[in-house]
């Protein structure tokens, strides 16, 4: 084997490895489910999102709703996107739910962490378990999440009963190298992981 040919192989291998290493990759970190899941199927599951980028929210809501319907669940994109914490936005959030006639809400939020392994501004599941108190926490985290360069996205999707405003299920995911893609292209693998988590916990 000539030295030039060997060098070419090495360079191609390095390029392939670098390409794989920088592709976004979503994994499920954990889930929590109430010991007493509702026996009746969800009549209408409203999808609402909180993140610092609306494009991510649009892609997630539309794709999640389509996939839920494909699995026999009436998932409905709210087409309401939240990035700021003001009293007006909090009122709009509550109004979006009240006007939807949904019996359950899937509330998803995306936060970003620094390139280091620390989890700056990541909210633990259980920090807030009420539907509207969780919104308060999510928005405060989402706003600070865009203040620095990122490499990893930590996201949580939680389902709440509108009656009683209690959380019945939650999942946390982590997407490495999320900064190399867009919301539209990030959403499919994130949605797929959430769906598998819902199946695992017998929500689908």
Predicted stretch roles:
Residues 20-43, 52, 138-204:
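C-terminal/domain-edge helix-coil "capping" segments
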Residues 89-159:
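Surface-exposed short loop/turn segments
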Residues 30-35, 59-73, 124-129, 198-204:
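Short low-complexity stretches enriched in small and charged residues
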Residues 42-118, 170:
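N-terminal segment of the mature soluble domain
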Residues 64-69, 95-96, 124-129, 176-179, ...:
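Short, low-complexity, polar/charged sequence segments that are solvent-exposed and flexible
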Residues 10, 35-37, 95-96:
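Short, flexible, glycine/charge-rich loop motifs used to bind or transfer phosphoryl groups or to couple energy/partner
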Residues 1-20:
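Sec-dependent bacterial lipoprotein signal peptides
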């Amino acid at each position: 084997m000539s030295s030039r040919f060997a060098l070419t192989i090495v360079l191609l291998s390095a390029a392939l490895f670098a390409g794989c290493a920088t592709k976004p990759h979503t994994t499920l970190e954990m889930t929590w489910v109430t010991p007493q899941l509702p026996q009746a199927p969800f009549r209408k599951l409203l999808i609402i999102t909180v993140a610092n980028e609306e494009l991510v929210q649009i892609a997630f809501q539309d794709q999640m709703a389509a996939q839920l319907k494909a699995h026999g669940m009436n998932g409905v994109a709210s087409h309401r996107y939240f990035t700021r914490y003001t009293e007006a936005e909090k009122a709009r959030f509550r109004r979006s739910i009240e006007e939807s006639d949904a019996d359950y809400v899937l509330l998803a939020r995306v936060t970003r962490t620094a390139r280091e392994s620390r989890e700056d501004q990541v909210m633990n599941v259980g920090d807030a378990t009420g539907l509207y108190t969780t919104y308060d926490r999510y928005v405060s985290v989402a706003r600070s999440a865009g203040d620095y360069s990122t490499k990893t996205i930590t996201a949580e999707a939680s389902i709440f009963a509108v009656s009683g405003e209690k959380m019945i299920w939650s999942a946390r995911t982590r997407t490495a190298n999320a900064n190399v893609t867009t919301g539209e292209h990030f959403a499919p693998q994130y949605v797929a992981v959430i769906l598998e988590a819902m199946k695992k916990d017998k929500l689908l």
